[in-house]
Amino acid sequence: MLTRKQHELLMFIHERLKESGIPPSFDEMKEALDLASKSGIHRLITALEERGFIRRLPNRARALEVLRLPDSIAPGLNAAKKFSPSVIQGSLGQGGLGRQIKPAPSRLPAAGNDDDAVSAVSIPVMGRIAAGVPIDAIQHQTHSISVPPDMIMGGEHYALEVKGDSMIDAGIFDGDTVIIRNADTASPGEIVVALVDEEEATLKRFRRKGASIALEAANPAYETRIFGPDRVKVQGKLVGLIRRY
């Protein structure tokens, strides 16, 4: 039997993972449950872990997995677990420096006998994205992957393999595959693919500092980088994440 706060936290974590594949931060959990401090979140997570509802993934900051839900809503969790995480092996496009990412439209695969394949959406893998020091701009599609349709909510999408550890406190790790919705604008606080000086691509949290744009890491080892507005172009916004365990 869960307490009301335990149940609220479990469902908040579950819904966030279902929407984006990324667990909420302790600050987000504290605000969602209207608690005064993060110590209360630590106690609730420990209680949920002891009861077998969640588990903390070892050696990974802020990495949580929902193992089960209360019996009355467990079928929804089972349905969400049909999709198995995988690692995408991307590569940098050659000769494409300084050009913007141009993903192909996401599309449904042809109907077949495999129910999972029919319900999946195929999106292009465009290579690697830096979650650290920016790397050369990504240009060419390497291959495609299939993702659950509820991860794609309209618009054009593409996938990138994460390289680096600057976003670990946002639950994004080296080797993860991020699902990006093509966009050229972002709201403050959103995680974006940013093209810097027409030649370097990086995955960072988007902020505004007066007339300037700040690309903020989610790792205290990395400094926030500030640029003039004409030096940064938003290439897309994070909508999901795929991970191999």
From Swiss-Prot:
It comes from the Bacteria. It catalyses: Hydrolysis of Ala-|-Gly bond in repressor LexA. SUPFAM superfamilies: LexA/Signal peptidase (SSF51306), Winged helix' DNA-binding domain (SSF46785). The record marks A131, G132 as: Cleavage. It is an enzyme of class 3 (hydrolase). GO terms for biological process: DNA repair; DNA replication; negative regulation of DNA-templated transcription; proteolysis; SOS response. Homodimer. This is LexA repressor. It comes from Mesorhizobium japonicum (strain LMG 29417 / CECT 9101 / MAFF 303099). The lineage of its organism: Bacteria, Pseudomonadati, Pseudomonadota, Alphaproteobacteria, Hyphomicrobiales.
